[in-house]
Amino acid sequence: MLEAIKTFMILYTGMFAITNPIGAVPVFMSVVGHLPAEIKHEVAKKVSITVFITLTVFALVGQWIFKFFGSSIDAFAIAGGILLFRMGMEMLSGKLSSVKIDEEDVTLEEVAVIPLAIPLISGPGAITTVMLYMTKESPGIVILTIIAIGLTTYGILYSGNKIIERLGRVGVKVTTRMMGLILTSMAMQMIINGIKGAFGI
């Protein structure tokens, strides 16, 4: 039981750093910040549900993707580690998001799915990570982690106003940099493990 809790906490911490829902708050608030609480609730709920569905689907079909493309887990770990390292370095530089939204051309439902849920929160890095987790850890713990990330995403986005007020834009940037540091260390370990596995070291 204690080992399962420890594994869950490790996976959750890693996924929280990768998805970085706090970094998505400024984008979320720029779209719905002026709207009633009911609409914020609906958009935040759609984002969290989309994040959960996206990550769960890729977690469940990840092994089939490996087999279909003839790729090994070690090769995927190296490629995924490089991708995560790049993301981590961007976060360390203070970049919150490169996603731009033209509010006149999209509905709130569309924004909830793209770009907020995909790729801002459940992007390539998060998808790669859950696929790798699924091959290394208990599937039940991985799915539980995804559920926890979905709920966390909802809570953070819905509390966007309070987070911005308490942290400020500087605080959000500092948090993003901290998540970036965690992410780069995870990425390096992923690359090292992939190289060890590929070359039998």
UniProtKB/Swiss-Prot annotation:
It is found in: Cell membrane. InterPro entries: Multi_antbiot-R_MarC (IPR002771). Keywords: Cell membrane, Membrane, Transmembrane, Transmembrane helix. It is a multi-pass membrane protein. One of its GO terms (cellular component) is plasma membrane. The keyword Transmembrane applies. The keyword 4Fe-4S does not apply. The chain crosses the membrane at residues 8-28, 49-69, 73-93, 111-131, 140-160, 181-201. This is UPF0056 membrane protein PH0760. Belongs to the UPF0056 (MarC) family. Its main location: membrane. PANTHER family: UPF0056 MEMBRANE PROTEIN YHCE. It holds the Pfam family MarC.
